[in-house]
A protein has these predicted regions:
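N-terminal secretory signal peptides that target proteins for export/translocation
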Residues: 1-13
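Bacterial N-terminal signal peptides
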Residues: 18-30
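Sec/Tat signal peptide C-region and signal peptidase I cleavage site
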Residues: 31-36
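Flexible coil segments in periplasmic/lumen-exposed cytochrome c-class electron-transfer proteins
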Residues: 37-45, 53-55, 63, 101-181
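Short, cysteine/histidine-rich loop/knuckle motifs that typically chelate Zn2+
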Residues: 59
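Short cysteine/histidine-rich zinc-coordinating motifs and their immediately flanking basic loops
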Residues: 69-76
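Extracytoplasmic/secreted envelope proteins and their assembly/folding machinery
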Residues: 77, 87-91, 143, 147
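Glycine-rich, acidic and aromatic/proline-enriched surface loops and short helix-turn segments
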Residues: 96-100
Length: 181
């Protein structure tokens, strides 16, 4: 005889089937929800603007992201066309810079609380590292726009040529003249 207020459980066999069915259903539906969406063209355009203007990334990385810097007084930037960084590592690098290199942190609070590689300003000082100041700090969404732009137009796209140059700028420009037609 059952005691009052005792929970009623389905037999183990039915419970196992229910749990299995629920997990299988979740696995079938999850990829559709977890798939990365392609960035909106306006986000890519905003990322290009931020790369060229506010972040002034081209001064070190070159307008094409190929490491051919545009300002000789700036540190040498990486060739972003050949980088193997995934999106998360790219965003972390933009936010936190790279200690020991010329890559500055664009996150206003980088190294204030351990969010960057688990380090704080005191850790950098102790190691004799000084981070360069960025031309401007960027909001998280702005950093994501730059990543959208880089993955759409630069990373993994191979060396720049005349056709890619026109596509990059959206029209024939003076910069494209250096590439044979």
């Amino acid at each position: 005889m059952r005691q009052p207020f005792q929970p009623v459980h389905p037999p183990r066999g039915r419970r196992a089937v229910f749990v299995f069915a629920a997990l299988a259903g979740a696995l079938l539906v999850a990829p559709a929800h977890l798939a990365a969406q392609a960035p909106d063209p306006s986000d890519i355009a905003e990322g290009a603007r931020l790369f060229r203007q506010k972040g002034n990334c081209q001064s070190c990385h070159g307008w094409a992201g190929d490491g051919r810097k545009m300002d000789t007084q700036m540190p040498d930037g990486a060739n972003l066309r050949e980088t193997r960084l995934d999106r998360a590592a790219l965003i972390m690098t933009i936010k936190c810079g790279l200690p020991g290199t010329g890559m500055p942190p664009f996150d206003k609070f980088a190294y204030s609380d351990g969010r960057c590689y688990g380090l704080k300003q005191a850790d950098l000082r102790k190691a004799g590292q000084r981070m360069s100041d960025p031309p401007a700090t960027l909001q998280n969404r702005e950093i994501e726009y730059i990543a959208d732009f880089l993955y759409a137009k630069v990373i993994g796209k191979g060396p720049m040529n005349h056709e890619k140059c026109i596509e990059f700028w959206g029209q024939e420009t003076e910069a494209c003249a250096e590439f044979p037609k």
